[in-house]
Amino acid sequence: MALWSAVPGKVYLPPSAPVARVLRTDEYVQETDVYFYTSTERLLIVGNPYFDVENRDTITVPKVSANQYRVFRCKLPDPNKFALVDKNLYNSDKERLVWKLVGLEVGRGGPLGVGSTGHPLLNKIGDTENPSFYLGEQTKDERQNVSMDPKQSQILIVGCAPATGEYWDLAKPCNDLENGAAPPIQLVNTVIQDGDMGDIGFGAANFPKLMQDRAGVPLELIDSISIWPDFLKMTKDIYGDSVFFFGKREQCYARHLFARAGQMGEPIPTENGVYYITPDSADQNNRSSHLGSSVYFTTPSGSLNTSDSQLFNRPYWLRRAQGTNNGICWGNELFITVFDNTHNVNFTISVKNDKTALTENYIDNGYKYNNADFKQYLRHTEEYEIELVFQLCKVNLTADVLAHLHVMNPRILEEWQLAFVPPAPTGIEDTYRYIKSMATKCPTAEPEEDTDPYKAYSFWTLDMTERFSSDLSQFSLGRKFLYQTGLLNGKRARTDYTAAGSSTRSTKRRRVR
C-alpha cells in the first residue's frame, strides 16, 4: 500500500518508491461451475465440566466445558488429484485447482441450557450492592461457596488459518519487584486451540499467574487461561486467511456485586475530604476502626437464553469475505472456531456406594435416605455436525501470480510441486558404502521433514478427503444452495463437470412436412 508522508514543509509528498500491492484472490482465481458437498459425522464429546479427573497422573475423564473453544481443522482432498470427467476443465501444465468455500452450516444438537459455574472457596466478603450493616474486621478466611451462571456468548470464526486470540499476562518488570508489589501486565497474542477457555465474564487473562490466592474466579478458570479472539488484528490481516467471516453475540449483566477480602495493595488515599470524609474515631463503629474493602467485582449472568438468538443451525453463504482472501482454502484446509455456551447442560449422576450403576434393584426395601450413601458426578456433553459446500476454482501459473503466492505463503508452491531449479553441484561429495560400520565415522543424522505448520497446536482434526460428493441435490445444505442460486428449480440437477463460461449451442432440428 502507498502511504503519503509528511515533510518539514507544508505539503505531503507521495512515497519515493512504489510499494507492492496485495492482490485479492478474485483477481487471479478463476471460478468454475463445479460444486462439491461434504459433511462430518455426528461429533460427540463427554467430560467433566470443571477439571480433568486424574488417576495416578493419567487423565481418566477429560475436562469438557461449554465455556471452551471447539476448533475444527477440516482436511480437504487435493483437487489436483481428482479424476475429473471434463478434461477441458483445466490444464495441469499451466493451472492448479483450489477449493473455495461458498456454504457452511454448523449444527448444534441437544437442548438449550443454562449451566452453573463456581468455586467452593471464592474470595468474596459481604454484599456491596444493598448491605444492611457495615462489616467489621475481617477474619483470616472469608472465602465462601459461590456459584453463578456465566456470561452468554456465541462465536463463529471461519478461515483457512487458525484464529488468533488475546489475553493479559505478566510482563517482565524494568526493575526488581518488591514482595507483595503489583506486577506489570501485557497483552499477549496466541493461537486459539481446541479446549481453550473463553471469556465468561471475568475477562481474558492468565489466571494461574495473576491470581495467586487461587480463589478469584470459578474452578473452570482458576487453572486456565481465558482467551478472547483478537478481531482487531485478524480483520486487519493483509491476506485475510484467519477469518473469511465471523459471527459474534454476547449477553450478560451483573447478578451480584461483591468485594475482595484481604489487604488493600493500593489503599484509597487518606487525605480528608478528597475521596471520603474521615469518620470520627471517638465513635466506636466499624467505619472508623475497619474501613471496608475497595476491591469490588461482579459475578456475571447470561440472563435469558432463547432459540431466537442462535448463530448456529442455520446456513451461511459466503459471497464476499471481509479480507482479500475470498474463501480460498490454501493448503486444502479449513479452520472453524466455535464458542457456544447456550447449550450449557451439566448432567448430575448419582451412584449408590454399595451398588454399581448397572444394578437393577439398587434400593432395598426399608431403606431410608442418607446423603453419605450416594456419590455425585458431573458430566457435560456436546454434539456437533458440520456441512460444507465448496466451489472448484483454478489458478493460472503466471509469473506475477507465482511471485505473489511465494511472498504470501511459500508452502502453497511446495504443495503444488512447484520449486526453483536447484543450483549445479559445486564439487564431488563423499559417499561411504558401510556407513554404519564401526570402522567408519558416525552417519550424519538427517533431519525429519516436518510438513505440518500447526504440529505444536491442538485441534479437533476432521478428515474429509473421502467425503466429497458432486451430487448436491442429495443433501440438505446442497439443496438449500441449489435453490438459493437458482440451479435447481424442480428439475434434476446436472452432475457433469463443465468449465465456467463455456457453452455449446445445440443445432436446431429441422421440421419435415
Curated annotation (Swiss-Prot):
UniProt-listed GO biological process terms: endocytosis involved in viral entry into host cell; virion attachment to host cell
Matches recorded under Gene3D superfamilies: Major capsid L1 (late) superfamily, Papillomavirus
CC per GO annotation: host cell nucleus; T=7 icosahedral viral capsid
Single GO MF descriptor: structural molecule activity
Subcellular location field: Virion; Host nucleus
Domain of life: Viruses
Keywords: Capsid protein, Disulfide bond, Host nucleus, Host-virus interaction, Late protein, T=7 icosahedral capsid protein, Viral attachment to host cell, Viral penetration into host cytoplasm, Virion, Virus endocytosis by host, Virus entry into host cell
The keyword Disulfide bond is annotated on this UniProt entry: yes
Protein task: Forms an icosahedral capsid with a T=7 symmetry and a 50 nm diameter. The capsid is composed of 72 pentamers linked to each other by disulfide bonds and associated with L2 proteins. Binds to heparan sulfate proteoglycans on cell surface of basal layer keratinocytes to provide initial virion attachment. This binding mediates a conformational change in the virus capsid that facilitates efficient infection. The virion enters the host cell via endocytosis. During virus trafficking, L1 protein dissociates from the viral DNA and the genomic DNA is released to the host nucleus.
Subunit: Self-assembles into homopentamers. The capsid has an icosahedral symmetry and consists of 72 capsomers, with each capsomer being a pentamer of L1. Interacts with the minor capsid protein L2; this interaction is necessary for viral genome encapsidation. Interacts with protein E2; this interaction enhances E2-dependent replication and transcription activation.
Family stated for the protein in its record: Belongs to the papillomaviridae L1 protein family.
UniProt cross-references to HAMAP family, sorted A to Z: PPV_L1
UniProt name for this protein: Major capsid protein L1
Gene, per the UniProt record: L1
